[in-house]
Amino acid sequence: MVKVVVDAMAMQRALTRITYEIIERNKGVDDLVILGIKTRGVYLARRIASRLQQLENVTVPVGDLDITPYRDDIDHDAQTEPEVTAANIDFSVEGKKVILVDDVLYTGRTIRAAMSAIMDLGRPKSINLAVLVDRGHRELPIRADFVGKNIPSSQRERIKVSVSEIDDRDAVEIQQA
């Protein structure tokens, strides 16, 4: 059984609200950079950056973060140091206010890995987390600073975020396992 809990309009409103909250919390967009976690976090990050451009008339740098080498749930060769494979980060995070964007916050492990990757890129002034969906069930003490929608769910359920750039539609669904 599949239940749509966020449609395209609700997703658009949530991202717009997150954008306003980012501006308010940071008192503007000075020294702000946005990093989207691959895959869907990248597209959400670009949408937030686009809204920031519209609202503040400033282009905020956006990058794509691949955290695969930093994940603790994948078997890695213990002899090799993780290497940031940030395919699309052409700016420094040193001293910047980083907005880390992902589609779903669940256990917190993806975010922990992303923070490790960011620290390998440099020492940011701060890191704030923006997620479209917070579903609970944390295994690590991580919380989002900006949340589009809280969707309590059981661990047997799956939250699926679809974005039009790769899925041909915008939606958030709960799927029964």
Swiss-Prot record:
Physiological role: Regulates transcriptional attenuation of the pyrimidine nucleotide (pyr) operon by binding in a uridine-dependent manner to specific sites on pyr mRNA. This disrupts an antiterminator hairpin in the RNA and favors formation of a downstream transcription terminator, leading to a reduced expression of downstream genes.
A GO BP entry: DNA-templated transcription termination
Name listed for the protein in its UniProt record: Bifunctional protein PyrR
Statement: the UniProt record of this protein carries the keyword Transferase: yes
HAMAP family, sorted: PyrR
Protein family: Belongs to the purine/pyrimidine phosphoribosyltransferase family. PyrR subfamily.
Name of the gene: pyrR
Sorted UniProt keywords: Glycosyltransferase, RNA-binding, Transcription, Transcription regulation, Transcription termination, Transferase
Signal peptide residues on this chain, from the entry's feature table: none
PRPP-binding (motif): residue ranges: 98-110
Gene Ontology terms, MF aspect: RNA binding; uracil phosphoribosyltransferase activity
Pfam families in the cross-refs: Pribosyltran
